[in-house]
């Protein structure tokens, strides 16, 4: 059955800030304590969404999470009304409070892993929210993510939703940032590539030394089971631990795939040549499979991480070609820009590039690919999706107006002591749930 891939981009939340919370994420650490501009951030993301819509692609919208997370502050011993809790937390532990204000749910590549219906034995699209338990501020996300997914994909005949994996390091799961699907077309059976950083139980597999491996082999295996994946639709590979120690905290910082193309760095995988051969042999399609391996001599790991070349989106266009959606940092890096120009002139489906200014997200370590969750859907499945989360010209205008009304243009450390930021944020999200027809998905709505 004909199908297409829909990118559901995360709307940046009203409390977007630079707290340097993500150890192993170089950009996040380097920009800690800088002033942020939430309004600019959300509008930059919306501009990218609108550009994809204008290209003829079906584009979805993924709502942000409610922040600050007062429930976790209550669990950690802070009491009183909302303003008192914020005041106490700000005075006792301002870093903790900033973590509870984090807008990291904007990076929906970490929201969940999605398996399309052609790959599953029951013919349904499967979703499992990521537990994200390697980082405290991200571990707060899975319950709300699951509620949002159920509000967006709310038809049991087509969609299966699973509880996130156990909240424990042995099953550390970072979602689609470590997952790519290869196929001849989105409506045909594909090969789902799961990339892990380490094994919790197998001590013989190497591990990074400096930075943590956030995705475990055991988590990836569990997702394959939960999603009822066909044996021929799954392959598990280990990321090169050496590049994790150089700031490649997810596979989507060192590789990106789409349909019958894998674009990866020469050092992306452990035992790379064998890994690439395994992918070629496991590919279930009939089309030529392209592996574009970027040599270190042309793009160093440092350049890959600073430019986020591999955190670009790779999307299929109606004429069968592919577009690389890259951050402007790639254009500013001469080595990376030269390689992109060489690549789009070579014999492969990628024949054009478009650069976007996503500086607000990039400074926290998230490029174009971080901001989107890919969901392949056939016509019946797309018709079953909540239509109000699909971007239209009208919806784009409504969302821009909503953001300009509700978002501040600067946030610094002292602003997190202001209870008005909470009320502004909650009011904005309450309005957004009506705009996207999500119902009650946030704790403050469910408890009110």
Curated annotation (Swiss-Prot):
A GO MF term = N-succinylarginine dihydrolase activity
Q: Where does substrate bind?
A: 19-28, 110, 137-138, 214, 252, 364
Q: To which protein family does this belong?
A: Belongs to the succinylarginine dihydrolase family.
The coiled-coil segments of this chain are: none
Q: Which UniProt keywords apply?
A: Arginine metabolism, Hydrolase
| EC number, UniProt record | 3.5.3.23
- Assembly and partners? Homodimer.
> Which purpose does this protein serve, as stated in its record?
Catalyzes the hydrolysis of N(2)-succinylarginine into N(2)-succinylornithine, ammonia and CO(2).
User: So where's the catalytic machinery, residue-wise?
Assistant: 174, 250, 370 (nucleophile)
Q: In which pathway does it act?
A: Amino-acid degradation; L-arginine degradation via AST pathway; L-glutamate and succinate from L-arginine: step 2/5
Set out the biological process GO terms recorded for this chain's protein: arginine catabolic process to glutamate; arginine catabolic process to succinate
Domain of life, source organism: Bacteria
Q: Which reaction does it catalyse?
A: N(2)-succinyl-L-arginine + 2 H2O + 2 H(+) = N(2)-succinyl-L-ornithine + 2 NH4(+) + CO2
In Swiss-Prot or TrEMBL terms, this protein is called N-succinylarginine dihydrolase
**Into which EC class is this enzyme placed?**
hydrolase
Q: Which Pfam families match?
A: AstB (PF04996)
């Amino acid at each position: 059955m004909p199908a297409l891939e829909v990118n559901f981009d995360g709307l940046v939340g009203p409390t977007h800030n630079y707290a340097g919370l993500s150890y192993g994420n170089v950009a996040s650490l380097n920009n800690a304590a800088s002033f942020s501009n939430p309004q600019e951030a959300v509008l930059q993301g919306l501009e990218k969404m609108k550009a994809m819509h204008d290209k003829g692609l079906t584009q979805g919208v993924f709502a942000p999470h409610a922040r600050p997370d007062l429930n976790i502050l209550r669990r950690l011993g802070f009491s009183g009304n909302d303003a008192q809790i914020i005041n106490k937390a700000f005075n006792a532990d301002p870093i903790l409070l900033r973590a509870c204000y984090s807008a990291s749910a904007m990076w929906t590549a970490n929201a969940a892993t999605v398996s399309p219906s052609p790959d599953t034995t029951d013919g349904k699209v499967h979703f499992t929210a990521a537990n994200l338990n390697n980082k405290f501020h991200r571990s707060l996300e899975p319950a709300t993510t699951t509620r949002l997914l159920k509000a967006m994909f709310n038809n049991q005949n087509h969609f299966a939703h699973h509880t996130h994996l156990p909240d424990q390091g042995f099953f550390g799961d970072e979602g689609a940032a470590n997952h790519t699907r290869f196929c001849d077309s989105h409506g045909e059976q594909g090969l789902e590539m799961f990339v892990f950083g380490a094994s919790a139980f197998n001590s013989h597999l190497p591990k990074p030394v400096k930075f943590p491996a956030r995705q475990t082999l055991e988590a990836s295996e569990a997702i394959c089971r939960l999603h009822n994946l066909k044996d021929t639709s799954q392959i598990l590979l280990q990321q090169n631990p050496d590049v994790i120690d150089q700031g490649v905290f997810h596979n989507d910082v060192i590789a990106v795939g789409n349909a019958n193309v894998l674009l990866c760095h020469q050092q992306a995988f452990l035992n790379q040549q064998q890994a690439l051969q395994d992918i070629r042999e496991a590919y279930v399609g009939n089309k030529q499979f392209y592996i574009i391996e970027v040599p270190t001599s042309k793009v160093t790991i440092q350049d890959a991480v600073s430019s986020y070349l591999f955190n670009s989106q790779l999307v299929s266009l109606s004429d069968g070609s592919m577009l690389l959606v890259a951050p402007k940092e790639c254009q500013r890096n001469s080595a990376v820009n030269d390689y992109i120009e060489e690549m789009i002139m070579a014999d492969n489906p990628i024949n054009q590039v478009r650069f976007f200014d996503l500086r607000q997200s990039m400074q926290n370590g998230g490029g174009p690919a971080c901001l989107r969750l890919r969901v392949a859907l056939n016509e019946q499945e797309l018709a079953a999706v909540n239509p109000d989360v699909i971007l239209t010209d009208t919806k784009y205008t409504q969302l821009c107006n909503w953001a300009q009304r509700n978002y501040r243009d600067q946030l610094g450390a002292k602003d997190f002591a202001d209870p008005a930021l909470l009320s502004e944020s909650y009011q904005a999200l309450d309005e957004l749930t009506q705009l996207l027809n999500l119902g009650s998905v946030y704790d403050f709505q469910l408890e009110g």
